[in-house]
Amino acid sequence: ATLSLVGKALKQINNPKAHLLFISLDPNRDNNLSNTNEWLRYFYPKADALIAKDEKTLQKITKQYNVQYQKIDLNDSFMGYSIAHSNMLYLIDEKGHFYKEISDLNPQEILRELRIFLNSQ
């Protein structure tokens, strides 16, 4: 749901500088970068995935951005497990500097925060 909301907001703003970066919390399933990027671009054309090469790298990335996640076994499901995670949007400038964390993910707030951020760049 978050990707859909962010993608809609970015399309509405239509700022050429806007780029969506998705950090996968499940490198075992999201192990094909090309397929994951194709899926992401359904939500926003200028989107790319970051997929950690191993659990240690993933832990480093999630610690840096204070992302909480947990693998939950689903014994009665064909999927086998699910990943529960915090739901945040991080605004990062072109130089990779952290700008702001957005935890209120209602559509109006996302749109407002993205406009403020993109206009400040």
Residue ranges of model-derived segments:
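Structural microenvironment flanking redox-active thiols in thiol-disulfide oxidoreductases
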Residues: 1-61
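Thiol/disulfide oxidoreductase modules built on the thioredoxin-like
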Residues: 57-113
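Non-globular targeting/processing and membrane-anchoring segments
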Residues: 112-121
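Detector for Asparagine
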Residues: 14-15, 28-37, 66, 75, ...
